[in-house]
C-alpha cells in the first residue's frame, strides 16, 4: 500500500498540468536500499546454523556411527531429533520476540546454538552428543522463526520477496559449508573428524553475535511498543525516500490500532492483542481471512518437508552409494556438488521472486520436483534389480538428485519462508510464523528419522515414488489455496485471504482500486477497501 501510494503521488504530480515528453519515459525501477539488505544478511546468519547442521550430519553420521559403534536406528534418531528439539525454540520464539524484540531474539538464537555446537564437538559419547543436539536444536528453532519475521518487517514492499528469501539462501550456504567441512575433515582420525565437523558450527554464531550490534530493531515491533520516534528513524534508513518511510509508518500504525493523529515519539498502544488473545484470534476464533492464512502457512510448511527434501540432502551419500558409487571420497564430492547446485539456484530464485511472482515459481518448482523424484525412484529401482553397476542408471540417479535440489531451491525452498512470514497480520505474525516453523520441524524430523526404515520397508526407489505422489497433492494444494502476494503490502494481505479459490477477485480489486488525487482531499492517496 505504502509503496503504491508513493508511486501514485509522484505520477499524479507529473500529469496534473501538461504532458511532457519525459512523462512518457519508462518508469524507473525502485532503488534497492543497501542498509535494508545489510540488516537482512545479518539477521539471516542464524539460518546458516541449521543449514550447516543438515549438511555436516550427512557425512559426520558415518564417522559417528563407526566411532561410537551405533546402530542405524540410533543414527536416524541423532540426525532427526534436532528438528524435534527445535520445536521448543520456535514455540518460545514468538513470545520472546514480542517481549525482548526481534533483534535480541536473533542474538539469543546465536548464543544458544554456539553452546550446543561446542557441546557436540566435545561430546565423549552418544548421550552427551544427544544433549548437545538438544541445546543446538533450541537455538535453531529460535533462528528459524526470527530470521524471516525480522527480514519481512524491515523490508520495503517492492523488494520484500528478494530480501525475505535470504533465510533460505543462508540455509543453503550452510548446507554447502557442511558438505565442504565433511570433505575437509574426512582425512582426520575417525574419533577427531566428526568432532571437528560439528564443533566448527559454533563459528557462525560468533559472527552473528558481533554483527547484530549494527542491526536496528524491527520498525513494526517498535510501533507495537508505542515507540513511534524510533520506528520512524529505522524506516528512514530502510526506505528509498522520506515520503515512503512516512507512508509505511502510517500503515503500521493503522495495523497496530494506533490513531493517526498520535505523532509523539512515545505513545500508548492498545493491549488487546497481547498474550492469550493472540492465540484466540489465531486458533480459537479466527476470522475467515486469518483461518485461510493459517491453512496456507501451515500447508506450505507441511508440504515443503513431507516431499522428502531432507531425505535427499541428509542421506545423499547413502543414495549415491546405493546407486553404485563405491568410493567414499567420490561420494563426498558428489554431495558437495549437491550443495553447490542448491546454493546457485537459491541465488537465482532471490532475483526472480519480485519479478515473476510467488505462484509461478512455486508451481514450476513443484512440477520439477515431482518429475525428478519419479525419475530418481525409477533409476534406483533399476539399480536395485541388477547385480552389476549400470553406468547410465548411476548417472541418472546423480542427475535427478541435482535436479531435485535445483527445483526445490528455485521455488519451494525460499518461497515457503517468504510466503508464510508475509501473510500474517502484524499482531499475529510472530506466533503465526512460530506455528509454521513448528510444523516444518516436526515433519522434517519425521522424514529424517524414518527414511532409513522407509527404504528398507518399501525399497529406496519406492520411497522416492512415495515422495513424488505426495508432491502431486502439494501441487494441487498450492494451486487452489495460495493467492499471489507479489507487490502487496503486509497490511493488505487480509484482503487477499478468506475467499479461497476466489482470491483472484480480491487481487483484481486491489490492482484496479482508484486513488483520489483531488486537491484538498483529506484522504488523498488512501485506498478504501469497503
Where do the PLM segments sit?
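Transmembrane-helix signature of 12-pass secondary carriers
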Residues: 2-236, 247, 260-530
Amino acid at each position: 500500500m505504502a509503496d503504491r501510494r508513493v508511486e501514485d503521488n509522484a505520477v499524479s504530480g507529473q500529469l496534473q498540468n501538461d504532458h511532457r515528453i519525459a512523462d512518457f519515459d519508462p518508469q524507473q525501477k525502485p532503488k534497492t536500499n543497501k542498509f535494508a539488505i545489510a540488516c537482512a544478511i545479518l539477521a539471516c546468519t542464524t539460518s546458516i546454523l541449521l543449514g550447516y547442521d543438515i549438511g555436516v550430519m550427512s557425512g559426520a553420521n558415518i564417522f559417528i556411527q563407526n566411532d561410537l559403534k551405533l546402530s542405524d536406528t540410533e543414527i536416524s534418531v541423532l540426525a532427526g531429533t534436532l528438528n524435534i528439539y527445535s520445536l521448543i525454540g520456535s514455540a518460545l520464539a514468538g513470545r520472546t520476540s514480542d517481549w525482548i524484540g526481534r533483534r535480541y531474539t536473533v542474538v539469543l538464537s546465536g548464543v544458544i546454538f554456539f553452546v550446543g555446537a561446542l557441546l557436540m564437538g566435545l561430546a565423549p559419547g552418544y548421550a552427551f552428543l544427544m544433549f548437545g543436539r538438544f541445546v543446538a536444536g533450541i537455538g535453531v528453532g529460535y533462528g528459524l522463526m526470527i530470521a524471516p519475521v525480522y527480514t519481512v518487517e524491515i523490508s520495503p514492499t517492492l523488494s520484500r520477496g528478494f530480501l525475505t528469501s535470504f533465510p533460505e539462501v543462508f540455509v543453503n550456504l550452510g548446507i554447502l559449508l557442511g558438505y565442504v567441512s565433511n570433505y575437509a575433515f574426512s582425512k582426520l582420525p575417525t574419533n577427531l573428524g566428526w568432532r571437528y565437523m560439528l564443533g566448527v558450527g559454533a563459528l557462525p554464531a560468533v559472527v552473528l553475535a558481533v554483527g547484530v550490534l549494527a542491526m536496528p530493531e524491527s520498525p513494526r515491533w517498535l510501533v507495537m511498543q508505542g515507540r513511534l520516534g524510533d520506528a520512524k528513524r529505522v524506516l528512514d534508513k530502510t526506505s528509498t525516500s522520506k515520503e515512503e518511510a512516512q507512508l509505511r509508518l502510517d500503515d503500521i500504525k493503522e495495523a497496530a490500532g494506533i490513531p493517526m493523529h498520535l505523532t509523539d515519539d512515545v505513545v500508548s498502544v492498545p493491549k488487546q492483542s497481547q498474550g492469550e488473545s493472540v492465540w484466540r484470534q489465531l486458533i480459537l476464533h479466527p476470522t475467515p481471512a486469518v483461518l485461510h492464512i493459517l491453512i496456507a502457512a501451515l500447508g506450505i510448511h507441511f508440504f515443503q518437508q513431507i516431499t522428502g527434501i531432507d531425505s535427499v540432502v541428509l542421506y545423499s551419500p547413502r543414495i549415491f552409494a546405493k546407486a553404485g558409487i563405491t568410493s567414499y571420497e567420490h561420494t563426498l564430492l558428489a554431495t558437495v556438488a549437491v550443495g553447490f547446485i542448491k546454493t546457485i539456484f537459491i541465488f537465482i530464485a532471490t532475483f526472480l521472486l519480485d519479478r515473476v511472482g510467488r505462484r509461478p515459481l512455486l508451481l514450476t518448482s513443484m512440477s520439477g520436483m515431482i518429475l525428478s523424484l519419479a525419475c530418481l525412484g525409477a533409476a534406483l529401482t533399476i539399480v536395485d534389480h541388477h547385480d552389476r553397476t549400470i553406468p547410465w542408471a548411476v548417472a541418472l540417479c546423480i542427475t535427478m538428485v541435482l535436479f531435485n535440489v535445483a527445483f526445490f531451491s528455485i521455488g519451494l525452498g525460499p518461497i515457503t519462508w517468504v510466503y508464510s512470514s508475509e501473510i500474517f497480520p502484524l499482531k499475529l505474525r510472530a506466533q503465526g510464523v512460530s506455528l509454521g516453523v513448528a510444523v516444518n520441524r516436526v515433519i522434517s524430523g519425521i522424514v529424517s528419522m524414518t527414511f532409513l526404515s522407509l527404504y528398507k520397508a518399501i525399497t529406496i526407489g519406492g520411497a522416492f515414488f512415495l515422495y513424488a505422489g505426495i508432491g502431486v497433492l502439494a501441487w494441487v494444494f498450492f494451486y487452489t489455496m495460495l493467492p499471489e502476494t507479489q507487490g502487496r503490502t503486509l497490511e493488505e494481505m487480509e484482503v487477499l485471504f478468506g475467499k479461497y479459490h476466489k482470491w483472484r477477485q480480491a487481487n483484481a480489486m486491489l490492482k484496479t482500486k482508484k486513488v483520489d488525487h483531488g486537491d484538498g482531499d483529506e484522504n488523498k492517496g488512501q485506498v478504501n477497501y469497503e
